[in-house]
């Protein structure tokens, strides 16, 4: 849309007039009363206050209206005959009668009667925000959203073209284009809007502040669980419309985001941005300033719990358990109290964790799509319906091959231990004449009479042999249980080589762990650590007279008393010597 819409010819062109100085009233006018020129070469259909740029489709021409002739009552539309005398410009009339409509989307070929409708439609498709607030420079996709946003500014705002002031709170309608063209001028640098609180809206539940009322409304759905945006193709619902738009792409093959390098397409913009890292070579764009870790996405950096050297600064006041994140501490503190902040909106029950509330809410669901064809009873899962139908058919799916007892579930059959009621033992061993009730028990017994060579399966750890693979699997021999390592001096067995090496020092007398403060040595490291605590305590209590150190403060006090007594005795002897002639 590089070409601009040329204005229809006028029979009585107006003479250009010099711009008159503006005399502003004491009370600033509202935005609806504020007039702006129809546009410039760069913005022929736009409003300089709202920052709107409107251009029609270049491939289509607007319906041409008949020019005004002398003696005629007034201009009329050449297509529909609509009277245009009350309009300041023929552009304000969009003809609805002709089929040659002026504003058509180049992507989906949808036709619009007004340029603003086309612009809003294209912005939603391309996820652009061309409607910019003149106060805070915030962008919006819809003009109505910008008008609603203007009500949040209560300070006086200057027009960027004619320097008039107006109240954005009264801006319910966009500015009209009835005034003559004025030269554009930049706004004065010394005039700024009145500062407002950054986040004036707060959540009544968790007191979290927000800058815009729409953000607060979207946040409140977290507490209420409301999901007003439902998918028409499945039963899923979402709390935000953008989530629904992303979800709908899973039902279709639409992939609107295309890589300009390799022409690979994606369903979501975030996937395309992540893919572009492969071409740019910047695989980790976000870096933590504390631990120097890199992340591909900013969300990963924000969720990264940076705690250098494994620190856990958040400690519970009840049990002194430490945590890395304050959220983990708050979640843990609920175990010590009766607080249940997650309440069910259908019953008075409360829960300490959110996942417990979500699991409980499933019990309130009344949807039972699986109906029984005989009694019309409904079930939430097809397996529950299958088990229920056994009541009508009197059939059991799982039967015991020994006693023919039936069970509804396979787990009940596995737990069933079938034992014949009679005391007969018809299965006898031909070697030792021992009798058994089952043939499987006799076969298992006969393996005990087999020679070692007849057992093909051998454990490589304990050298035991087995006849069947099931026995070999159940054996589960591993070094952690069998203690395969044996001491060559006392034949004591150990599980691990480190245990055996530590034990060998008993026989060799080796003491590899030496104290750096004294000449003592130890066989085990834990003994050295315990000994070094003695030196640490010695450093705490030092005598100020002679520098000697002690393990206990009582010993230091007793030692200091000796210095005090000696000093007192020396002072008394000096006084006596001074009195003698």
Swiss-Prot record:
Q: Where is the composition biased (Low complexity)?
A: 1-22
InterPro entries, per database record = Znf_C2H2_sf, Znf_C2H2_type
> Which segments carry the region annotation Disordered?
1-39
Q: Which UniProt keywords apply?
A: DNA-binding, Isopeptide bond, Metal-binding, Nucleus, Phosphoprotein, Repeat, Transcription, Transcription regulation, Ubl conjugation, Zinc, Zinc-finger
Q: Recorded GO terms, molecular function?
A: DNA binding; zinc ion binding
Record GO cellular component, one term: nucleus
Cross-link Glycyl lysine isopeptide (Lys-Gly) (interchain with G-Cter in SUMO2): residue positions = 129
Where the protein is mainly located, per its record?
nucleus
* Protein location: Nucleus
Where are residues bearing Phosphoserine located in the sequence? 280
Q: From which residue to which do the C2H2-type zinc fingers run? A: 75-99, 103-125, 131-153, 201-223, 229-251, 257-279, 286-308, 314-336, 342-364, 370-392, 398-420, 427-449, 457-479, 485-507, 513-535, 541-563
| Tagged with keyword Transcription regulation | yes
For whether the record's keyword set contains DNA damage, the answer is no
Q: Which family does it belong to?
A: Belongs to the krueppel C2H2-type zinc-finger protein family.
What is this protein for, i.e. what is its function? May be involved in transcriptional regulation.
Name of this protein: Zinc finger protein 319
Encoding gene per record: Znf319
């Amino acid at each position: 849309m590089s070409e601009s819409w040329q204005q229809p010819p006028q029979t009585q062109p107006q003479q250009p007039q010099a711009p008159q100085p503006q005399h502003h009233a004491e009370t600033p006018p509202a935005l609806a009363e504020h007039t702006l020129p129809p546009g410039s070469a760069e913005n022929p259909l736009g409003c300089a206050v709202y920052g709107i740029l409107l251009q029609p489709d270049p491939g289509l021409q607007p319906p041409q209206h008949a020019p005004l002739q002398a003696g005629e009552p007034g201009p009329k539309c050449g297509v529909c005959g609509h009277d245009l005398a009350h309009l300041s410009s023929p552009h304000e009339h969009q003809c609805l009668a002709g089929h040659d409509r002026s504003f058509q989307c180049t992507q989906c070929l949808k036709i619009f009667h007004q340029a603003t409708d086309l612009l809003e439609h294209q912005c939603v498709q391309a996820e652009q925000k061309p409607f910019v607030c003149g106060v805070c420079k915030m962008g919006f996709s819809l003009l109505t959203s910008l008008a609603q946003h203007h009500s949040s500014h209560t300070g006086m705002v200057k027009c960027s073209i004619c320097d008039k002031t107006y109240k954005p709170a009264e801006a319910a309608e966009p500015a009209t284009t009835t005034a003559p063209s004025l030269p554009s001028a930049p706004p004065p640098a010394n005039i700024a809007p009145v500062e407002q609180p950054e986040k004036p809206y707060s959540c009544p539940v968790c007191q979290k502040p927000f800058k815009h009322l729409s953000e607060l409304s979207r946040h409140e759905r977290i507490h209420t669980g409301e999901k007003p945006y439902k998918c028409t193709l499945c039963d899923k619902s979402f709390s935000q419309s953008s989530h629904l738009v992303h979800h709908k792409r899973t039902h279709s093959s639409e992939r609107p985001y295309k890589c300009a390098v390799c022409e690979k397409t994606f369903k979501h913009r975030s996937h395309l941005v992540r893919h572009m890292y492969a071409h740019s070579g910047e695989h980790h764009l976000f870096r933590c300033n504390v631990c120097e870790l890199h992340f591909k996405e900013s969300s990963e950096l924000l969720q990264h719990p940076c705690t250098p050297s494994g620190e856990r600064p958040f400690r519970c006041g009840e049990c002194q358990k430490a945590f890395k994140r304050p959220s983990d501490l708050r979640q843990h503190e609920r175990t010590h109290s009766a607080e249940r902040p997650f309440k069910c909106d259908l019953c008075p029950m409360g829960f300490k964790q959110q996942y417990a509330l979500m699991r409980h809410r499933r019990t309130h669901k009344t949807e039972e799509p699986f109906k029984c064809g005989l009694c019309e009873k409904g079930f939430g899962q097809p397996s529950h319906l299958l088990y229920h139908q056994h009541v009508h058919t009197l059939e059991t799916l799982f039967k015991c091959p020994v006693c023919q007892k039936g069970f509804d579930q396979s787990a009940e059959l596995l737990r069933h231990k079938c034992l014949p009621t009679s005391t007969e033992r018809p299965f006898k061993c031909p070697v030792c004449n021992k009798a058994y009730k089952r043939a499987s028990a006799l076969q298992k017994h006969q393996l005990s009479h087999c020679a070692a060579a007849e057992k093909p399966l051998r454990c490589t750890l304990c050298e035991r042999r087995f006849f069947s693979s099931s026995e070999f699997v159940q054996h589960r021999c591993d070094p952690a249980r069998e203690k395969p390592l044996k001491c060559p001096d006392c034949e004591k067995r150990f599980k691990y080589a480190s245990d055996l090496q530590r034990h060998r020092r008993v026989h060799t007398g080796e003491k590899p762990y030496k104290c750096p403060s004294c000449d003592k040595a130890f066989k085990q490291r834990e003994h050295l650590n315990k000994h070094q605590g003695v030196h640490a305590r010695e450093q705490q209590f030092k005598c100020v007279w002679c520098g000697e150190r002690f393990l206990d403060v009582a010993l230091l006090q007793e030692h200091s008393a000796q210095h005090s007594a000696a000093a007192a005795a020396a002072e008394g002897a000096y006084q006596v010597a001074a009195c003698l002639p």
